[in-house]
Amino acid sequence: MSNATKKTTKKTKKISPTQLTMAWMKRRGFIAQIVERWNPFAKVRQDLFQVIDIVAVNEQGDLLGIQVTTRANISSRRAKVRESLGARYWATHNQVEVHGWQKVGPRWTVKVCEMEYDKYKAMWVEKEFEGDTSKKAAQ
C-alpha cells in the first residue's frame, strides 16, 4: 500500500463534561474538586449525597455543589437533584447547580441551572454560557 492511499486518522481527544466544568470553574475564579467516586464492587460512580459531582469554592466564600451532565440529560439530572434530601440541605446554605454541556460546531456551550430552595419547593434558574472550546477547556 502506497503512502498516497493510506488513510490518515487524526485522534481526537475526548473530554468529559466533568473536565469541561473543572476547567470552566477555574477560569471563573473557583477552586474545584471532583467528589464522585468509582465503586469497584457495585461498578458504578457514586456522587456526594447522591447528586454532587464537583464541589467548588471561590475567594468570596461561595460554595457550589455541581451535578455535571450533557445538555440532553439536564431534565433528568434536575429531577434527581430536586428529589435529593442531601441537595436540599446543601441548598439551604450553599448553591447547587446542574451543568449541561453540548458541542455546537467547534465550541462547547454550557447551560447552567441553579437550584433555589426554600422549605416548600425547589425552583430552578437557568443561564446559558457559550464560547468554551474544547481546546481552551482542556488547558
Task: For each feature predicted by the language model, list its residue ranges.
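Catalytic phosphate/metal-binding cores of nucleic-acid and nucleotide-processing enzymes, i.e., regions
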Residues: 2-139
